[in-house]
Every structure is written in C-alpha cells, then in structure tokens.
Amino acid sequence: MKNNNVTEKELFYILDLFEHMKVTYWLDGGWGVDVLTGKQQREHRDIDIDFDAQHTQKVIQKLEDIGYKIEVHWMPSRMELKHEEYGYLDIHPINLNDDGSITQANPEGGNYVFQNDWFSETNYKDRKIPCISKEAQLLFHSGYDLTETDHFDIKNLKSIT
C-alpha cells in the first residue's frame, strides 16, 4: 500500500467484489458519506461495508484468498482487515431477519436494532450504490466524542438537500 488512503479505485474494486460474490451489502462510514454527497470530500483510511451476515464465512474467506489480513477481530460485530494494495476494509455483518428487522451484534453483547429505511441506495459516478442513509449516518455520528473528521462528515451530510 503506497499510503494510508483508500481511493475511489479501491472502493469500486471492493463494491465489485461484493457484487460478484452476490452478497447484499451497504456502504457505510466516510465513503458512505461521500457517495451520498455525490463526490469525494476527503481522504479515507478505510472502506466500511455492512453486509448480510449469512455470508460472513464466504466474505472472510474471499478477502483472505485475495490477500487481506485480519487486523481487528471483534466478530460477530465487526472485523478490520488490511491489504497491501487495497488498504483497510472494515466489515460489519448484519442480520436480515425473517420478521423484516435488521440487527447487528453489539460487541458488549445483545444486538443493535436498525430501521429498514436506513438501508438505501444512491447514484455515484453513474453507478447505483447501496448505502446507509443520511439519517442513519447522522445518528451513527452521535453518542461519542467526535473527531475533526466526524465534524467534517456531519457538515457534508447536513449539506445534502
């Protein structure tokens, strides 16, 4: 990896990878904010992907097969992996439950419960990208001490009409 930034090229590579695996996913985090605004607003250390938890083993195996190494293992809540060429990837398995609810394992035990309408899609660079909604992004940027980057992302989210 030339630097610590994950570019649009790596982003599209990862999105293509999830689509080729036929795994339902949503872009989250900083790249999710930028996709919602319609342009890259800042540099990114990683890509955050929420995905259908029933495919967790398949996703991890594929990522390891192409050279990703596990850096942080907080499963079933999240896992952070690093690739020398593609950079950091933060994966978050989510449960698409039969009753229509969506949950994610909480690292302290129990589950986070998400609203279905938080999982949306937007157009970015002539591509339809599943992503976490503006409302959910704003909610996820609360309840902790915000960084300068968080404040920047919130400002950009609030600029979306």
From Swiss-Prot:
The keyword Transit peptide does not apply. InterPro entries: Aminoglyc_AdlTrfase, NT_sf. Coiled coil: none annotated. The keyword Transport does not apply. Pfam families: Aminoglyc_resit. It comes from the Bacteria. Keywords: Antibiotic resistance. GO terms for biological process: response to antibiotic. This is Lincosamide resistance protein. The lineage of its organism: Bacteria, Bacillati, Bacillota, Bacilli, Bacillales.
